[in-house]
Amino acid sequence: MLLKLQIQLFASKKGAGSTRNGRDSHSKRLGAKLSDGQIAKAGSIIYRQRGTKIYPGFNVGLGGDDTLFAKISGIIKYESKRGNRKKVSVYPQ
C-alpha cells in the first residue's frame, strides 16, 4: 500500500517588506534655471549639473559643484563648442 503525502513548504524567512523598503533620496533639482535668450543678473545660476555636461563660455563661471553662474548681467546664449560639447555664455545687453 502506497501512502500519498502532501507537503506544504513555508518561507524560512519573512518577505522583505516594509522594513527594508521605503527609502528614497530627495530630488536635487538639476538642469537649466535660465533658458536661451533670457536676461540674467550677475551671480544668478544658469545651469545646475553633476559633472560638466555644459561648459562655461564668455562671462560664465563654474562653481565647485559644477554649477554655471553669470559673472555679469546680460542675455543667455547656449552654443555648440568643438565636437559635441555645449557651452553657455552671457553677452551684455
From Swiss-Prot:
It comes from Phytoplasma australiense. Residues 1-10 form a propeptide. This is Large ribosomal subunit protein bL27. Pfam families: Ribosomal_L27 (PF01016). GO terms for biological process: translation. NCBIfam families: L27. InterPro entries: Ribosomal_bL27, Ribosomal_bL27_CS. Belongs to the bacterial ribosomal protein bL27 family. Keywords: Ribonucleoprotein, Ribosomal protein. The keyword Ribonucleoprotein applies. GO terms for cellular component: cytosolic large ribosomal subunit. The N-terminus is cleaved by ribosomal processing cysteine protease Prp. HAMAP family: Ribosomal_bL27 (MF_00539).
